[in-house]
């Protein structure tokens, strides 16, 4: 179970989404379309917490990855909680909540070397599926999923065929 508790108050439209959580849980997926700045990241974090399983969050850029970490820290964690105990930004060192870019995921799925915004990672020989299974990841969150590039989509499709038991949260502005 993820120990995340939102410290703020929900906007009416956010509450409407969250009130349907049991429907999403039964369906195994949530697809949320909302305007930029409407709080999709916050809803995504709350849905992950409610699903209660280790989760993998995929984002289009390192900047957005950092925004997720910051939002978790400021809006969900109590003062005594350490973000590093709960969140990882590295597929090779997964935690209950692992947040990486689509590019890093693509590189790991295809066992490639990755270079992104000055961050280098070598996934040659790395078994992403085995690592996800060992971590018992059961929730996948796709942030800004309208930004998916063709090669990222192919990696996600291959992943979904091999890793079927996932609850999927898709967040998009279009």
Region locations from a protein language model:
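Conserved pre-motif I regulatory segment
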Residues: 1-33
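Walker A/P-loop
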Residues: 26-47
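Residue-level preference for the first positions of well-ordered beta-strands
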Residues: 29-31, 54-56, 96-97, 139
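Conserved RecA-like helicase motor-core motifs
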Residues: 31, 76-89
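The conserved Walker
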Residues: 36, 61, 172
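Conserved Walker A/P-loop ATP-binding site and its immediately adjacent core
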Residues: 41-76, 104, 152
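Conserved motor-coupling elements within RecA-like helicase/translocase cores
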Residues: 88-98
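SF2 helicase catalytic motif II
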Residues: 102-105, 110-170
